Amino acid sequence: DLSPRFSPDIAVLLNLSPDHLDRHGSMQGYIQAKWQMFENLQPGSTAIIGVDGSDEAALAEIAETYDAIVSVRISGQAEKTAKVFYLEGWLYDQDGPIVDLSAIATLQGAHNGQNAAAAFVAALSAGADREDVIKAFASFQGLAHRMQPVGEIAGDKGHVRFVNDSKATNAEASAH
């Protein structure tokens, strides 16, 4: 929103949440600021939109009306309209399973499933080889302060896992 003429080759919107309303004044203002990136896409550009929320799904429908833009729906919740989605630890596309994310410690959870879906589509859109992208997932080290394992304590009634997610910007993002 600080670069009104920003026109990427690949634009990604994962989700919208009301945690930035102080900056945008309203949810509608926030959505409009995010949508501006898609308005500026040139023919042949790719719009990657998470469709797990109703606002995001509505934006995906709008993006699909732009004939010159390749619009790709992604989901962290196995949304049936998504071209790439996460389900029970696996990343899928319309041809079937892509990669078992549950076997990759740094890519656990539906939120990382959605992140992986976006990365997968973005990389392919940029010309990367499908198998190279799949291999890259296995070597992903994770990001500092983002779901970074700190340690575990085992006890009589189970165990507690400590995770550093200090970059989470709201309570919903940090509740895992």
Which residue stretches match the model-derived regions?
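AMP-binding/adenylate-forming catalytic core of the ANL superfamily
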Residues: 166-176
